[in-house]
């Protein structure tokens, strides 16, 4: 209980002390970084994805139960990307970039269970995922990470769990 209170106070200090201008600057910086990394993949159809994201609240939307501040969704996506780069031990591949950054597209119009919506949105926007990328995004919450054999899915699940703070509650789920 004490650590939760300390975390809450620290979050208030860090996020509560930012002016609206500072928060807007952070959101804009995250948007620019997100788009720059996506464009660097050179994947056909990526401009269509960016165009569709510009017409939504993706860059300003909170991520849900975690990253609840303005711009939390894009912040979480960037964190998942950075974590995947750390745990993959290879040069970041196009698939790592795409699955990390695009795994929560389904939260754009819906805050609940979303993985199938992420894959659906990307397809509707004319963006083609590989089969492995689609499975990684679709299953990044399902069935528990210990069952993932494919590296891409496993690493996306682990990175998402780390970014959301899931590791902080693992003892409550009897997983340690």
Where are these regions (language model features)?
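Acidic/His-rich, divalent-metal-binding segments that scaffold phosphate/diphosphate chemistry
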Residues: 23-110
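Sec-dependent N-terminal signal peptides
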Residues: 4-12
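An active-site-proximal "capping" alpha-helix that borders the catalytic cofactor pocket
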Residues: 80-83, 112-126
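C-terminal motif of bacterial Sec signal peptides marking the signal peptidase cleavage site
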Residues: 15-16
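Positively charged n-region of N-terminal signal peptides that target proteins for export
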Residues: 1-4, 101
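RNase H-like, Mg2+-dependent phosphodiesterase core
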Residues: 19
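Histidine/acidic-rich helix-loop-helix segments that form or flank divalent-metal centers
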Residues: 96-97, 119-122, 127-176
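Secretory-pathway/luminal and periplasmic proteins that interact with or process carbohydrate-rich
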Residues: 105-111, 142-147
